[in-house]
Amino acid sequence: MKITALLVLKCDPETREPVILANVSDLSQFGKFSFYRSNFEEFIVFIARTVARRTPPGQRQSVKHEEYKVHAYNINGLCAVGFMDDHYPVRSAFSLLNQVLDVYQKDYGDTWRFENSSQPWPYLKEASDKFRDPAEADKLLKIQRELDETKIILHKTIDGVLARGEKLDSLVEKSSELSLASKMFYKQAKKTNSCCTLL
């Protein structure tokens, strides 16, 4: 999954064009001296301004363009725009944009309202690198991934025990810890389940 660009823009309804306050892009897919690199940078700026201008304050929106999704989040005229590949989860993208706006407002306060040009902001590059993995941006996605990994480990462990030549049926029969009623319940449940799978 790839984050191609992150931008922070001032979207003042009184001005025609949104002003780019900070931006970072990863155009490594194009060669260092490639003709397409400068064209793609212009494309990013054009699309970012267009999407930011059309994202009302307090709103979020996503626009799909070819293999990219452009996500925008506008908070009272301060708008974050992200260019991600199509596989980057939407929820993670908006979580990242929200965090970018929070940190920008903490760093600059309301001074952004008076800015009319792009300023270097190192955090944007840090965020682009750190959140390349969507689980870093979305804590629920991270928890889900950890649960999935735990489930895989549990399945491997159970399969490993059973793969040593022991079957669950023989373990139940040999068990002295299970009561006769529990053993009968296991056998009846197994018969019921096998009956249902044949249908």
Swiss-Prot record:
> Which lineage?
Eukaryota, Viridiplantae, Streptophyta, Embryophyta, Tracheophyta
**Locate the Longin domain: which residues?**
7-131
Tell whether DNA damage is among the UniProt keywords. Answer: no
Q: Which compartments does it reside in?
A: Cell membrane
Topology in the lipid bilayer is annotated as: Lipid-anchor
Describe the protein's quaternary organization and the partners it interacts with: Interacts with SYP41. Core constituent of the SNARE complex required for membrane fusion at the trans-Golgi network.
S-geranylgeranyl cysteine: lipidated positions: C196
Q: Which UniProt keywords are listed?
A: Cell membrane, Lipoprotein, Membrane, Methylation, Palmitate, Prenylation, Protein transport, Transport
Database matches in Pfam families: Longin, Synaptobrevin
* Gene Ontology CC terms, in alphabetical order: plasma membrane; SNARE complex
Q: What does this protein do?
A: Involved in the secretory pathway. Essential for membrane fusion mediated by either SYP41 or SYP61; triggers the fusion of phospholipid vesicles containing SYP41 or SYP61 and VTI12.
Q: What is this protein called?
A: VAMP-like protein YKT62
Q: Which residues form the v-SNARE coiled-coil homology domain?
A: 139-199
> Sites of S-palmitoyl cysteine lipid linkage?
C195
Main subcellular localisation: membrane
Q: Which Gene Ontology BP annotations are present? A: protein transport; vesicle fusion
